[in-house]
Design a protein with these regions (language model features):
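Conserved N-proximal alpha/beta basic substrate-recognition cap immediately N-terminal to
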Residues: 1-49, 55
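CheY-like receiver
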Residues: 55-56, 89
């Protein structure tokens, strides 16, 4: 995204700004944005070393997620259940960080994960598709299936659309 934003600016094409591209690419910037705009999100900490990550983990008193700041497709993402897990996964996770020698550790929230895909037009955001994710047992942070549907008997997709179309 940052490359597209930069080229679009140089070529005077309509696209995301470089600031918006950074926001969508850097998970710590997105978490800060959510906090500043009163959007509910998990507690988090940008960490440049394991000691800081362990300190945050102890404060949470429960599961956390360790992830690269700027990776996608769940590469380098691990559920942290005990402090030693940070030692085990730190190096592997940081290998997937493309532009910063830091990781994000955040509070783990139990539940179903959804993906909401959409498009931004001059009149606002329009949610186009919602998927319910199914995860591997061996690494529950990696989805093996995204089940797209227009309706779900167990969850209020209209509410998901409404929330996502708000911004």
């Amino acid at each position: 995204m940052p490359t597209i934003a930069y080229l679009s600016k140089e070529l005077k094409l309509s696209s995301l700004s470089e600031a918006d591209a950074a926001l969508y690419t850097d998970k710590s910037l997105m978490r800060k944005f959510c906090k500043e705009h009163s959007i509910s999100s998990p507690a988090f900490c940008k960490c440049t070393n394991m000691l800081k990550a362990k300190e945050f983990f102890r404060l949470q008193q429960g599961k956390c997620i360790l992830k690269p700041l700027d990776s996608n497709c769940s590469k380098g993402v691990f559920i942290i259940e005990k402090e030693n897990d940070i030692d085990q996964y730190w190096e592997e996770s940081i290998r997937f960080s493309k532009c910063d020698n830091a990781l994000l550790i955040e509070q783990y929230i139990e539940g179903v994960e959804f993906t909401v895909d959409g498009i931004v037009t001059p009149v606002g955001h329009k949610s186009l598709a919602i998927s319910e994710k199914r995860h591997y047992d061996y690494n529950p942070s990696i989805a093996y299936e995204l089940f797209f549907s227009n309706h779900n008997d167990n969850y209020d997709y209209e509410e998901l659309r409404k929330i996502n179309n708000y911004f």
